[in-house]
Amino acid sequence: MIYLKYNCPLTYLILLKLEGGKTVEEKTDAEQRNATSEEDTEIFENPGEGLEKATFAAGCFWGIEEAFRQIKGVVATAVGYSGGHFKRPTYEQVCTLDTGHAEAVRVIFDPEIVSYKTLLDVFWKIHDPTTKDRQGPDVGKQYRSVIFYHSDEQKAAALASKEELEKSGAFKNPVVTEIVPVSEFYMAEDYHQQYFEKKGFLQNIFRSFKK
């Protein structure tokens, strides 16, 4: 695998759009789920037959979620808080108190369409896994790089993927990404869910390229 160091989800999404979606296929509106509707929240704990869960932390969860939402085979996404010791934290508490949580993205996917390895490949591309407790200007433990595995198979895949990345020489500095068992995932407030989509952020950027 060739590791292209986009280092942030926005760069990845813009390049994906400019390349015509050759890396991963863009989904139609009909395929995208609204994670915050009442009927859909259950899917993030109990996906149902034929679906699997993945959980990642890679900095501010807004852009990370949007990157995973573009992948064919991803059925639903939600942002939340994981890896901490504080029950049902709010965004303000995660940002200002030592709750130990990371801003995380829960991904529900169909392994018949997209593999967990593909999700790992995207994860490495959309952030800098060599910076501890920060991504770009965002500094704090909540912005740390983490792969939360849901099974022994995911753990093995994550460790192998990390080793492959380290051997590739793509990064000069050591990879500091944590690979840990999944812990309680607390859904973030509604206004954080699909933030880029709600704000039309990417659409405005893409329109500017056409001018």
Curated annotation (Swiss-Prot):
Alphabetical list of InterPro entries matching this protein: Met_Sox_Rdtase_MsrA_dom, Met_Sox_Rdtase_MsrA_sf
Gene from which this protein is expressed: msrA
GO biological process: protein modification process
Superkingdom, taxonomy of origin: Archaea
UniProt-recorded name of the protein: Peptide methionine sulfoxide reductase MsrA
Keywords: Oxidoreductase
Keyword field contains Cell division: no
Catalytic residues (positions): C60
Family according to the record: Belongs to the MsrA Met sulfoxide reductase family.
Protein role: Has an important function as a repair enzyme for proteins that have been inactivated by oxidation. Catalyzes the reversible oxidation-reduction of methionine sulfoxide in proteins to methionine.
